[in-house]
Amino acid sequence: MTLKDKTTVTFYNGLTTIGGPMIEVAYNKSHVLFDLGEVYRPELKLPDESYQTLIKNQLIGDVPNFYDPKITGKPIDTERWEHSAAYISHLHLDHSKVLNLLAPEIPLYAGPITAHLLPALNENGDFLLPAAGHEKNYTRPIIAAEYKKPIKVGDITLEIYPSDHDAYGATGLLVKTPDKQIAYTGDIRLHGYHPDWVRAFMQAAKGSDMLIIEGTGVSWPEEKHDENSEEFTGPKNEVELTEEIMRLQNANPDRQITFNTYPTNVERLLRIMSDSPRKVVLHAKRAHLIKDSLNEDYPYYYLPEDKKYSDLNPELEVSYDELLADNHRYLWQTVSDYDKLQVGGLYIHSNAEPLGDFDPAYKPFVEQFAKNKIEFIALRCSGHADEKELKEIIGGIQPVILVPVHTLHPELEENPFGERILPKRGQTATL
């Protein structure tokens, strides 16, 4: 370390898109990168997901000295950088999908739940992008960081904090250099199961020299007062959402009720199973994910074409035919064969895939239920802070510099406590 050393922050991706933030903090010969996701743009209809294609379409950042040279063809400058590390905030693909592209010698940190769940989610090789020289279902080593325990990366220290998002085990990050502190929220909200965790992170981050905050909640100003706004309709918090699913069951005692949720929203699923008046039955693939990651057993069923999982308890299997014939005993997760559901039934789509109107697959997916005279109810609870919550988080941290990312409209987030910068891709800020 010399007197001339400065903390720099370089913004490589995810600045005016929903997802895909890639940001480097550097000091002297040490640097860290977060996150490692891919921007979701299904409308591009890309020919492949090669490194070159992703770079060309700006779906990942063109970050030097972090990607695997086997993929980029460019060596890592180990003379310039003596200490390197990377971090992912949570399970969602716009923050994790390209982690296998990281050079294998660079340590990758995540919260303990994220580190444990990612290999399980990628068991079939269809979650993460593949690593060079490995089978497609390989997941590179991820170090499960202890919450709030400092991680030394040369002159830089990382501290990982539990947070709240609709991905199980989401975290926020504090990056400390010899002269500055940078806080990164990852994806964050105050209306989930753990607002107390978010407030503890806000307290730890208070007065940071820079706050890098997601801004999904200000991405649709034209829908600000629209009751049909896709991101912020329905229940105002996760507890209300669970209660509404219970109410729908109680209001429809003699009706087939099915549902689906997003695989990484494990906590919502656990709450539904815990509170449901009906017996909840999961598709075997989801039951296997829960067993593999949490070592907990739940009732499940197989579709006729499904492979069998040796870790599932045979005594908990429910036959698919029994579920199709049922209209009062079960609340079950349906993932296909929607035309086999009972006419007049009810299907609850709770932030499951396809995720919404921005996905070309969503409209035909919804329309098939009407065609089969099945009521379709979308029950969403956003994983992201809305405009009011974003102001509260910024107000709790009171940063010197605010950098909104992960939003279509970063200019709509303001910093009453200091400066706000709106960096371009590849731009470096010196603190």
Language model regions located:
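C-terminal regulatory/interaction regions
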Residues: 1-2, 12, 16-17, 274-278, ...
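His/Asp/Glu-rich metal-coordinating catalytic cores
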Residues: 2-17, 21-85, 94, 98-264, ...
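Short connector loops at secondary-structure junctions
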Residues: 37-39, 214-223, 285-296, 380-389
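Short, charged, surface-exposed secondary-structure boundary motifs
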Residues: 43-45, 118-123, 170, 193-195, ...
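Short internal beta-strands
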Residues: 106-116, 212, 279-289, 348-351, ...
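Hard-cation-handling environments
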Residues: 226-335, 339-341, 405
